Structure formats: C-alpha cells, structure tokens
Amino acid sequence: MTNRLVLSGTVCRTPLRKVSPSGIPHCQFVLEHRSVQEEAGFHRQAWCQMPVIVSGHENQAITHSITVGSRITVQGFISCHKAKNGLSKMVLHAEQIELIDSGD
C-alpha cells in the first residue's frame, strides 16, 4: 500500500523536542500550508495545518534550523495518533525535510 505525502508550508508552532525512554529523539511542530489548486477546471484555495513529527537521529540536525516562520518541504507518511482526550488526529511522519530559500 502506498502512503506518501509531500507538503510545503510555514512552521506555525514552536518545535518541541523530546527524547523517548528508549533514547530516540523526536521533534514535533505544526506546518501550515496555503496554496491555490485547480479542481474540475476551477481554482480553489487549499489550506491545512498538519502536525509533523521527526523521529530518529538522521533528521534531527536539520530540525535545529527550524523555527516558527521557517518555510520547508516535508516528505513522509501519514498516520493517526490518538490524543489524551481520545480523539484521533492525522500526523505527518517526516522522512525528508528541505528548507525553502526565502530569497533574502
């Protein structure tokens, strides 16, 4: 089964870094995406806020460059996480992160 998502946008929540009891580092943040997409011959506004989690040592170095306002492209897979309140939310598990040059 295919489960791939590529999403670009702006980090809109301060990254939260934790280390699991087994020693695996995790970085969590929220990515806000806004774009204009074409559907059925019409232009429509597309918008979402997607929670992102970066796990493992491989991508942790780049997460230290990520702050609120950073423009990035994230590639990975999606999965549901159950919150403490019992509600499920979709989360993007990042496997590759690229900083988007702001052109400044």
Curated annotation (Swiss-Prot):
Gene Ontology cellular component list: primosome complex
Endoplasmic reticulum as UniProt keyword: no
Alphabetic keyword roster: DNA replication, DNA-binding, Primosome
GO molecular function list: single-stranded DNA binding
Location of the SSB domain: 1-101
GO biological process, one term: DNA replication, synthesis of primer
Alphabetized CDD domains for the sequence: SSB_OBF
Pfam families, A to Z: SSB_1
Coiled coil: none
Described purpose of this protein according to its UniProt entry: Involved in the restart of stalled replication forks, which reloads the replicative helicase on sites other than the origin of replication; the PriA-PriB pathway is the major replication restart pathway. During primosome assembly it facilitates complex formation between PriA and DnaT on DNA; stabilizes PriA on DNA. Stimulates the DNA unwinding activity of PriA helicase.
Subunit record text: Homodimer. Interacts with PriA and DnaT. Component of the replication restart primosome. Primosome assembly occurs via a 'hand-off' mechanism. PriA binds to replication forks, subsequently PriB then DnaT bind; DnaT then displaces ssDNA to generate the helicase loading substrate.
Family: Belongs to the PriB family.
Protein name according to UniProt: Replication restart protein PriB
Organism listed in the record: Escherichia coli O1:K1 / APEC
Gene: priB
